[in-house]
């Protein structure tokens, strides 16, 4: 399976750090966040990665090159105008060759067995699988409603209309999708990938949720950036295992 890392964001809440460095290149434990995610992908057998670029985008290829230094192959998708999660993924669709793709955020660090996630996606014959977390403030992050059979039926209130017994989850920004879902999105326009998932649900596509309770950090604010450095120092992230390949 190929992967895509979303790395085009402006990182406005981390200014002034992001005035001169794109957020995915900010270091944690001395290594850029996006490199930790590349190493996690490699550890789970993924070697082909697409990275989208916008804000200070030239710096990311300068840092990562073509991926050969990591034993990987990196293709870049440049966005002259930022396209959001949906538009960015749709622009890169040509690189997926009609096959499912694993999507990660370049500014999120987590400990997840990606092999188990990919196995679940295949076993469920899903059009999309969203990694979900239990969170008392799920609605603040964007409420995802999932049945006891792990089927996602509504996202931010949109999706299936009939009343169903559901549990509240938040979307962790880690997902697998089949490119056919991208047909619902406009080309060359900023949009959210969640729009494609909502349309898929309404069209009867199988959109599944995968619960994940392990370490996860969206490094979006100075406070969370400082916290993830402390978490790494405390060993909550097994970064050394990624760097050695064990």
Residue spans of the language-model regions?
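N-proximal low-complexity "stem/linker" segments adjacent to membrane-targeting elements
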Residues: 1-5, 10-16, 25
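Conserved N-terminal catalytic core of the sugar/cofactor nucleotidyltransferase
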Residues: 2-5, 27, 31-105, 114-116, ...
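Histidine-centered beta-alpha loop that forms part of the nucleotide-sugar donor binding/catalytic region
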Residues: 8, 54, 133-134
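Active-site metal-binding loops of divalent metal-dependent hydrolases
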Residues: 10, 107-108
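Hydrophobic packing residues within well-ordered alpha-helices of enzyme cores
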Residues: 14, 60-64, 228
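Catalytic-core segments of class I nucleotidyltransferases/pyrophosphorylases
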Residues: 46, 100-102, 109, 115-122, ...
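A short, conserved acidic/glycine-rich loop-to-beta-strand motif
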Residues: 124-134
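Short acidic-glycine loop/turn motifs at beta-strand connectors
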Residues: 145-151
């Amino acid at each position: 399976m190929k992967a895509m890392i979303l790395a085009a964001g402006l990182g406005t809440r981390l200014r002034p750090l992001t005035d001169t460095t794109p957020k995915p290149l900010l270091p944690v434990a001395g290594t850029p966040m996006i490199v930790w995610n590349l190493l996690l992908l490699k550890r789970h057998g993924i070697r082909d990665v697409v990275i989208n670029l916008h804000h200070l985008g030239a710096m990311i290829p300068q840092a990562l090159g073509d991926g050969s230094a990591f034993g990987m192959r990196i293709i870049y998708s440049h966005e002259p105008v930022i396209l959001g999660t949906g538009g960015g993924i749709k622009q890169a669709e040509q690189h997926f060759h009609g096959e499912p793709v694993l999507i990660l955020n370049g500014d999120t660090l987590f400990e997840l067995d990606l092999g188990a996630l990919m196995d679940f996606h295949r076993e469920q014959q899903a059009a999309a699988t969203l990694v979900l977390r239990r969170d008392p403030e799920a609605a603040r992050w964007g409420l995802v409603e999932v049945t006891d059979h792990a089927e996602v039926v509504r996202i931010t209130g949109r999706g299936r209309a009939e009343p169903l017994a559901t549990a509240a989850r938040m979307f962790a920004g880690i997902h697998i999708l089949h490119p056919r879902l991208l047909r619902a999105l406009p080309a060359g326009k900023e949009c959210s990938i969640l729009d494609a998932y909502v349309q898929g649900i309404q069209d009867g596509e199988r959109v599944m949720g995968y619960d994940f309770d392990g370490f996860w950090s969206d490094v979006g604010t100075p406070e969370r950036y400082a916290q993830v450095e402390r978490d790494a120092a405390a060993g909550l992230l097994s970064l050394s295992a990624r760097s050695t390949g064990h």
